[in-house]
Swiss-Prot record:
Component of MIOREX complexes, large expressome-like assemblies of ribosomes with factors involved in all the steps of post-transcriptional gene expression. This is MIOREX complex component 7. Associates with the mitochondrial ribosome. InterPro entries: Mrx7 (IPR020301). Pfam families: Mrx7 (PF10906). It comes from Saccharomyces cerevisiae (strain ATCC 204508 / S288c). It is found in: Mitochondrion. The lineage of its organism: Eukaryota, Fungi, Dikarya, Ascomycota, Saccharomycotina.
Length: 86
């Protein structure tokens, strides 16, 4: 079910963000005098995943756009052989 208002959408986005949960966890520890556990904020594999630069994203968008334009006007796709069709 979609959110009924923009406030509800922001609420769902906030509750689903890991950064918000890290912040709440830190505040909770400080308020209750709990020492910070070094293993709770371990780095995840997300840090090591491939992150394309804005230039790479633009280049990919440009390639896909022109390939789509070619197919729209009846020409053969150039990128069709680069993707698996299962």
């Amino acid at each position: 079910m979609p959110p009924r208002s923009i406030e509800e959408w922001f609420y769902y986005k906030l509750l689903s963000s890991p950064g918000f949960h890290r912040f709440v966890r830190k505040v909770y520890r400080k308020v209750n005098g709990i020492k910070e556990d070094p293993f709770t904020d371990q780095s995840t594999a997300f840090q090591y995943l491939y992150k394309p630069t804005p230039r790479q994203k633009f280049k990919a968008l440009r390639l896909l756009f022109w390939d789509e334009m070619r197919s729209t006007f009846g020409f053969r796709r150039r990128l069709g052989d680069r993707f698996k069709k299962d």
